[in-house]
């Protein structure tokens, strides 16, 4: 695990983060709904709690939140906490959804990616956006942008960080990235099996307890691969090739 150096950086979603000592300051995209999300993170044991349960506003009118600086997952670690992450997500997905939360952020993320995608991937993005819009979803509590980088180590173990896309919807979206990376050949079978088995054992509602999970995961996984293909560096070739196969 690593806490990393102190520096300002932008995120793929348009937010900005500064680390100052033991505090992480996050400037969110204008208009990001934060009041209900902060209240959830302050009370729910699946999240690293904020230092303030209400947002501030900077000189440009952008909402600002304050967080404790916690160790995050080091991608160079030999082992990743797939089992712990699966149990954490199942716990979140089984929790009652508080009133006032918006929908999760996948539709907005896919739309942003569509505007940045290379020409050959735009038709795929349009097709996935149409399928997403037509998808009937339950109103469960979801993180909305989950991957291993969204884990922070708190006093009692791993918890979730980054509330920008927390909302209501199908919990299958929180399994989208590992599912998509596994389908693209970028996540080993053992890791995917450990993650899926632990999620099912914890009662996670995103997939059937037994049988093929892919009818539920197919669209979220395809969306996750497209998003990663547009944003990625070292794995871009494999992800773009996976997108080409999806487009056929």
Residue ranges and their predicted role:
Residues 30, 72, 158, 166-168, ...:
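Activation segment
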Residues 6-25, 130-173:
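Active-site acidic catalytic loop and adjacent metal/ATP-binding pocket
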Residues 172-205, 222-237:
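Active-site activation/catalytic loop segments of kinase-like enzymes and analogous catalytic loops
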Residues 63-77, 94, 111-115, 222-237:
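A glycine-centered beta->alpha junction motif in the catalytic cores
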Residues 1-5, 34-37, 62, 238-248:
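Regulatory N- and C-terminal appendages and interdomain linkers associated
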Residues 73-123, 137-139, 168:
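A cross-family kinase active-site recognition segment
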Residues 24-65, 71-91:
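A conserved alpha-helical element in kinase catalytic cores
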Residues 206-221:
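All-alpha amphipathic helical-bundle segments outside canonical DNA-binding/catalytic cores
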